[in-house]
Amino acid sequence: MFSDTHFHLHYISEKTGIQEASAILSGMALAGAEFGLDIGTKADDLLCRRDAVMQAIALLPAGQKDAVEKFLCFSAGIWPGVDSIKNREACVCELRSQIEAFTKPGEPFCKKLVAIGEGGIDHHWNPSGVDGRCEDDFDAGLYEGERELFMMQLSLAKELGLPFIVHSRDGFEDTLDCIKKSGYNRGIIHCFSYGIEEARTFLDMGWHIAFGGGTTYTKKSKMPQMEELLRFVPEDRLLLETDAPYLAPVPFRGQMNTPLLIRHTYDFIAKIRGISTEELCRIVDKNCAELFGIQPAGV
């Protein structure tokens, strides 16, 4: 019933173990998930992510295995971490190698690589965060390297004919400039964090907009603008995601997020748009099928 266009199952399994990842996949199967996209962030993570998923699936009953193998898809991409930026050419070469091995006929999930990403621009400075991102470390070389890494991946997506999952945080102008220079406008602006005018720009270029659990705990003073934005995005460009294990929706804020919690984001956004949760599911499922060129799991 629910589609989730962005989660990191490998991060969840690293935190909690394969059995918990298996339980999450089981829950998604029992809930009738239509589409789930496990997102890549490192040049060399695609094959190990697939192998971890295979271990998790092996713990499931036969009927659930079939369901997971139908709804679960993968992306491959390089998040703009400092090390990846500094070694961008080698990283993109490794990414290509991983994609070639993953898509080799006869390999598990060989036809389930449906996107490149996530990659993009991140100028949210958080020295205590996972990446230890500090503005003082970002000299002119790193700024340009980040842009180059993004555009190299956009070129790869264009070459392979796959949608691109854009990570853009506090970097709208650079993101827009890179996309324009690449000439490629197919994919998702994930975990959208800008306003209506920025959304309009991306939409006019052909991009989809994805919202996550962060919408549910928007500050009260900013909620009118958030509601306006959630109503502004047209039906045929709207997608929903968890970004699990991050950004758990209310009432689970501060806890580890999983794709099983996406119902709360659907309920929240459906209410704002004045439609039923079931209708919103239908809309998002259709958009996923069209963007990624897949048949919905329930068909």
State where each predicted segment sits.
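Mid-domain alpha/beta scaffold segments of enzyme catalytic cores
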Residues: 1-299
